[in-house]
């Protein structure tokens, strides 16, 4: 269904899908040589398209090479400007009714896609990516930190499970250290490039993903790491995948704030990183169905392991329950002696219960799923 309101060079449409109804601005006979309307920042002068792929355009202009990205669903950069030193921010754009519909950058796109780098040198690439995401987490937490919104995060998982009709069900009792902050939200490989061992992050302004996935901006920084793990599962060769994942996680920990990367914060018994990899896998599945793409096998393989992970976590909790019983008994025995139900000789049970409790608790901790 067409809509009348649209900027010059665009046509407006209302797109109805099983996931909802969205307004879309389609680029149509856009005049790159005279970009008018509500422009901001620096834009190319007298440009023409030299190459295009999807919503991305390479431009030749009087003042050099430029790149442009069309945002059919609009976007607002508000909030992410604080990450400008660590991500590739546009130098200008075209706005319509408060939403950006075009972004511009000077120069050509540099480096190789992350998907190719993960095949050529997965471990080094994961090290650089983890460090980059850790630095972003550090800066984001310094600028903005909200309370733990466990209920909202778990409700979103339920909504996706219901929509996708998955055979999985997973909720997490997130640790108190898990707090919301500015994140990249939907980290996808086409948004990431590798240049001389360094990482260039772009494309955090969204597209259909930002509309369809309904992600709140304030999410835990570890959710970006979970999304990165999903990308590694998709593109990294199997024989190097485990080492690459471990390197990605450890390099993130080396740069991220200790408050969100400590052993307690990554506690697998409380979901840790695994719950965010799970969410990212559901995101990937949802996008595949929305775009009528073949569902990726790596998602199916990972989701098939969820029940195994949950079973191991349940078994580990049995050790925790036994430890709690021993600690409780170490308190009840002295009380029973005070009330006259036990003799002094029986107080020897107290250190035995305490020792057993500590031992069982250590077994419980040792059985926690690996963070990576």
Please give the residue ranges for each predicted region.
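Cytosolic/matrix-facing juxtamembrane and C-terminal tails of multi-pass cellular membrane proteins
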Residues: 115-118, 366-372
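Alpha-helical transmembrane segments
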Residues: 335, 355-366
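Catalytic-loop of the protein kinase fold
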Residues: 177-191
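Conserved ATP-binding subdomain of kinase catalytic cores across diverse folds
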Residues: 2-169, 212-239, 356
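Pre-DFG segment of protein kinase catalytic domains
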Residues: 200-204
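Active-site activation/catalytic loop segments of kinase-like enzymes and analogous catalytic loops
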Residues: 196, 207-260, 277-294
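Cytosolic-side membrane-insertion boundary helix
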Residues: 301-330
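Hydrophobic alpha-helical transmembrane segments
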Residues: 336-354
């Amino acid at each position: 269904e067409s809509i009348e309101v649209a900027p010059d060079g665009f046509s407006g449409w209302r797109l109805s899908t099983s996931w909802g109804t969205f307004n879309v601005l389609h680029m149509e006979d856009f005049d790159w040589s005279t970009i008018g309307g509500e422009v901001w920042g620096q834009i190319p002068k007298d440009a023409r398209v030299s190459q295009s792929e999807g919503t991305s355009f390479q431009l030749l202009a009087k003042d050099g090479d430029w790149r442009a990205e069309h945002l059919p669903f609009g976007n607002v950069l508000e909030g992410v400007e604080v990450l400008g030193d660590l991500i590739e921010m546009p130098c200008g754009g075209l706005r319509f009714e408060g939403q950006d519909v075009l972004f511009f950058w000077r120069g050509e796109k540099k480096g190789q896609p992350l998907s190719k780098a993960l095949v050529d040198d997965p471990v080094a690439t994961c090290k650089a990516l983890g460090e980059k995401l850790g630095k972003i987490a550090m800066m984001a937490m310094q600028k903005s930190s909200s309370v733990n919104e466990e209920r909202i995060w778990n409700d979103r998982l339920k909504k996706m499970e219901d929509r996708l009709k998955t055979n999985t069900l997973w909720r997490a009792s997130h640790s108190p250290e898990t707090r919301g902050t500015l994140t990249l939200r939907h980290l996808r490989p086409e948004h990431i490039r590798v240049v001389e061992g360094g990482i260039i992050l772009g494309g955090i302004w969204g597209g259909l993903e930002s509309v369809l996935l309904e992600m709140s901006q304030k999410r835990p920084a570890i959710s970006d790491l979970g999304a990165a793990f999903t990308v590694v599962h998709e593109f990294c060769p199997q024989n190097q995948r485990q080492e690459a994942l471990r390197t990605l996680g450890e390099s993130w920990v080396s740069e991220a704030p200790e408050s969100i990367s400590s052993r307690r914060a990554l506690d697998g018994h409380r979901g840790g990183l695994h719950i965010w990899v799970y969410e990212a896998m559901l995101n990937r599945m949802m996008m595949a169905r929305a775009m009528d793409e073949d569902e990726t096998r790596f998602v199916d393989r990972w989701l098939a392991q969820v029940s195994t992970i949950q079973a191991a976590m349940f078994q580990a909790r049995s050790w925790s329950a036994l430890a709690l019983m021993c600690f409780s008994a170490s308190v009840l025995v002295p009380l029973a002696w005070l009330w006259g139900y036990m003799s002094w000789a029986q107080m020897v049970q107290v250190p035995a219960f305490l020792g057993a409790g500590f031992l069982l608790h250590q077994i419980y901790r040792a059985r926690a799923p690996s963070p990576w």
